[in-house]
Swiss-Prot record:
Localization (cell): Cytoplasm
One Pfam family per UniProt: TAL_FSA
Involved pathway(s): Carbohydrate degradation; pentose phosphate pathway; D-glyceraldehyde 3-phosphate and beta-D-fructose 6-phosphate from D-ribose 5-phosphate and D-xylulose 5-phosphate (non-oxidative stage): step 2/3
Main localization (coarse): cytoplasm
InterPro entries, A to Z: Aldolase_TIM (IPR013785), TAL/FSA (IPR001585), Transaldolase_1 (IPR004730), Transaldolase_AS (IPR018225)
Key word Membrane present: no
Gene3D superfamilies, sorted: Aldolase class I
Protein name: Transaldolase
Cytoplasm listed as a keyword: yes
Gene name in the database record: tal
Family: Belongs to the transaldolase family. Type 1 subfamily.
Length: 318
């Protein structure tokens, strides 16, 4: 009998949530996603030292200003890792815009253009890239403009229905609703444990998936941030699921028989008027979990980006 991972692949596109090339070789996902925390982790793998050296050397050629060099080296390293991953996956790589730009539409767009240009200079077409942006109002507006230019986006740190609805209305290519971080918040808030069926993160992604299919939106739903394989099994049938190496290994070692849980609606109905900025901000603000987790997620990605830059600054000084 096929293991649980192989069964899951027949219902859902599997994406590796890692910058670890060895893990990607092992589990053969369709796509891969990275973020500042994963790039920081990957940068500490000895096999990646040549990619870092290349980024440092390139950055020194671009500018004499140390702050600009750090910025350039950081972007180049993320792209170098992405290029290596794309040698192993048939699909796409998601590369994230600096979380510190989460509330600046214009700078987010400029950073996206720079990342796409670096990939193109490395021989990678934009059709194989997803630009990751936080699901703030500004991030969603940036994505709307990028999509109109033919640059596909992955809207991340998505914790609420309001964020999901705004992304669909903006014509975003893909969203990454977080499952495990929603569970974390509710467990801490209520002191309760949840089984996979009643897991608040699973319930959230299911609601978003059903809404998208019911209204005929083409935006891809890619569940993310899992705490256990029960959550993953309950979301079998979701368009895509991005899963870290430890849970990919657990799925590969499991023999649990699974069935699709998410099934697209057979008929569609027209959606209502798009959310205004004021409606979006009000609806989002009504969800304390989403407000907490989005703010925390942006802060934590910014912290890890800062740690990466400290490491790069030391190398640039040599």
């Amino acid at each position: 009998m096929a293991n649980t991972l192989e069964q899951l692949k027949s219902y859902t596109t599997i994406v590796a949530d890692t910058g670890d090339i060895e893990a990607i070789k092992r589990y053969q996902p369709e796509d891969a996603t990275t973020n500042p925390s994963l790039i920081l982790k990957a940068a500490q793998i000895p096999e990646y030292s040549a990619l870092i050296d290349n980024a440092i050397a390139w950055a020194k050629l671009q500018s004499a200003d140390i702050e600009q060099q750090i910025d350039d080296a950081s972007d180049k390293l993320a792209v170098n890792i992405g290029v290596e991953i794309l040698k192993l996956v048939p699909g796409r790589i998601s590369t994230e815009v600096d979380a510190r730009l989460s509330f600046d539409k214009e700078k987010s767009i400029a950073k996206a253009h720079k990342l796409v240009r670096l990939y193109q200079e490395a021989g990678v077409d934009k059709s194989r890239i997803l630009i990751k942006l936080a699901s703030t109002w500004e991030g969603i507006c940036a994505a709307k403009e990028l999509e109109q230019e033919g640059i596909n986006c992955n809207l991340t740190l998505l914790f609420s229905f309001a964020q999901a609805r705004a992304c669909a209305e903006a014509g975003v290519y893909l969203i990454s609703p977080f499952v495990g971080r929603i569970l974390d918040w509710y467990k801490k808030d209520t002191g309760k444990d949840y089984d996979a069926v009643n897991d608040p993160g699973v319930v959230s992604v299911t609601e978003i998936y059903n809404y998208y299919k019911q209204h005929g939106y083409n935006t891809v739903v890619m569940g993310a941030s899992f705490r256990n394989i029960g959550e993953i099994i309950e979301l079998a049938g979701c368009d895509r699921l991005t899963i870290g190496p430890s849970l990919l290994e657990e799925l590969a070692n499991s023999q649990v028989t699974i069935q699709p849980k998410l099934i697209p609606a057979s008929t569609t109905v027209a959606a209502g008027e798009p959310l205004t900025e004021a409606q979006f901000r009000w609806d989002f603000n009504q969800d304390p979990m989403a407000v907490d987790k989005l703010a925390e997620g942006i802060r934590n990605f910014a912290i890890d980006q800062g740690k990466l830059e400290v490491m790069l600054k030391a190398k640039l000084a040599n």
